[in-house]
């Protein structure tokens, strides 16, 4: 039997002290929370912190593990966290055309991909952590 090959990703819903959420505008998916692939030899929370820094310029602290989204057909497992900013300044990259903090209500209007919007809602629903969503 061949070894399974899964892509492991990590994303973070970063909330500032005004309860605004950090979003970036991806050229592929539009507005979303920061995240991406965990590198070989990297801890999953460390990957979430690194991806947030790379995509937004913001340094974060992980507050809580929220849950898992598994895309079965594409073999992608995305771990989701809640985080808070601890430093840094907004920067953009090839992965992020724009970066900013937005009210939860505004963010949910801005995020157009249903799956990405659901991830935010699941992360904010702390009573139901941890969650696992397969699709």
Go through the PLM ranges and name each one.
Residues 15-20, 28-30, 72-74, 85-89:
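Short, charged/polar surface micro-motifs in flexible loops or helix N-caps
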């Amino acid at each position: 039997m061949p070894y399974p090959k899964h892509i492991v990703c990590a994303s973070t819903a970063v909330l500032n002290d005004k309860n605004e959420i950090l979003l970036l505008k991806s050229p592929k998916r539009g507005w979303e929370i920061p995240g991406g692939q965990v590198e070989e030899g990297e801890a999953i929370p460390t990957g979430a912190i690194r991806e947030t820094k790379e995509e937004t310029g913001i340094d974060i602290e992980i507050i809580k593990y929220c849950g898992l989204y598994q895309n079965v057909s594409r073999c992608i497992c995305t771990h989701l966290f809640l985080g808070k900013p601890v430093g840094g300044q907004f920067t953009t990259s090839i992965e992020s055309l724009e970066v900013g903090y937005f009210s939860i209500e505004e963010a949910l209007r801005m995020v157009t991909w249903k799956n990405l919007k659901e991830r935010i809602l699941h992360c904010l629903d702390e009573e139901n952590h941890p969650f696992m969503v397969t699709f």
